[in-house]
Structures are given as structure tokens and as C-alpha cells.
């Protein structure tokens, strides 16, 4: 009788272990099938440093004084049109990278001393978002970013100055979308 109980006990344990493994495997498969925004987050502390916040806003203010085109807004409601809230950080990552590469670096000799302090800060944010990807459809995001890039390029140097003048909006949009 004791031998029969032991063999049933081992059989039950084996069945239980196999069931657990099956559940874990199914859970892992389902987790892989879900669309995930990878690391599309920034720490709130990035946006709570008074010195760099001040420098970013001062740079934007100085550039906006040189901006004579008041009819165009680069970072506003149109930029987010058709983009779900969960994908807005990815959108802002794209805008940040464009701003760094195509606007701030070519204009890096202007608006000193703010530029030399703000560019490394924004580069740090860009690096923190480097693994931010979306696995879903990003058609609206790409369309909106392309429209922003085309507007800046069409305006030429004036567009670059406008983009620098909107660094305060970029800063706030990054905080709102990525924290």
C-alpha cells in the first residue's frame, strides 16, 4: 500500500511539474506576442534640475528673439495628431534626435553659453531613449516627423532658429510623454 501511495505521489508531482512548465511556456509565448514599447521612459529627475531647466529655457528664449516667423509652430497639436498616448515618447525621441543632429549641431556656435550646456543634456536624454522602439504601426509618427523636418528645411536657417526657439516646448513635451 505504501509503495502504491509513493508511486501515485511521484506521478502526481510529475503531472504538476509538467503542468507548471506548460503554463510558463504559454505565458512566455503570449508575452512575446504583445506589442511592447521598449524603454520609452525617462526619469523625472532629468526634468527637475533647476540649472539645466533654466539654461534650456534661456536658450529657447534667446533664439525666439531672433525668430521672425510667428506663423509657424513646430511642436504643437499637429505633431501629435494620430499618435496614441503610449507612442508619444517614441515620437518625441524622433523629434529630439532630429533637433540634435540637424539643428543644434549645425548651429552649435550660436547662442552661447547656453548651447554648450544644453546640447550635452539633450544628448544624454537621447542616449537614454536609444532603446525606445515601438513594435506597432508607426506610420502617423513618421508622417508627422517628416512634416516637421520638411518645414524646418523649407524655412532654412530661419527654421533652425525656430526649432531652437521651441526647445522649451521640446523639453516640456519630452517630460509629458516620457516620464
Curated annotation (Swiss-Prot):
Glycosylation (residues): 54, 68, 97
Identify the keywords attached in UniProt to this record, alphabetized: Cytokine, Disulfide bond, Glycoprotein, Secreted, Signal
Q: Name one Pfam family in it.
A: IL22
What InterPro entries does the entry give?
4_helix_cytokine-like_core, IL-10_CS, IL-22
GO: which molecular function terms?
cytokine activity
What GO terms describe the biological role, i.e. biological process, of this protein?
negative regulation of inflammatory response; positive regulation of transcription by RNA polymerase II; reactive oxygen species metabolic process
Q: Where are the transmembrane segments?
A: none
Disulfide bridges in this chain = 40-132, 89-178
Subcellular compartments? Secreted
The identity of this protein, by name, is: Interleukin-22
Source species of the chain: Mus musculus (Mouse)
